[in-house]
Amino acid sequence: MAGAFTNEMAGHPENFINQMKNHREYNIIIDLPAAQRFFAEWPTPIVASGFEVGLQIKMTPATMKNDYEYVANHPLKKAYIDYRGLDNEQCTWDLTSILYAARPDRGYFGVSEPGVVSVDEKGLTRLTPKADGNVRILTLSPEQKVRVQTTFEWLCSEKL
């Protein structure tokens, strides 16, 4: 769950907006006690990118096949090959967290009102609104979805 550990943590322990009420996120259930402790004890603000945000924004096969050829072993291309292959669209769960952590004030995402996250014994997460809560969840409008998709295609294939 390591993310951008500055004054604010941006990560992607998932499914807080309750759009997928019975989704159990892998990064939560793989170490349930750690996830529960993390949300109960983390001392600084958290901005999390929920499962539903990364699910909406896809990396296209054309981008994965054509835009990462400028290096022999592009790490993103390798990850996509290992996960589902290059013939399938790929969700961008990790990339949404990275984009927010790197460019939080550029309007790529909205954020929810503050709240607290609970993680139950099955690994289901819930955000309960609370004015002094330390967790906010990324939100995504239709316009932001298009903008983030385009940004990913440009940034992930940019030659250094």
Where are the regions a protein language model picked out?
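N-terminal acidic, glycine/proline-rich low-complexity segments
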Residues: 1-160
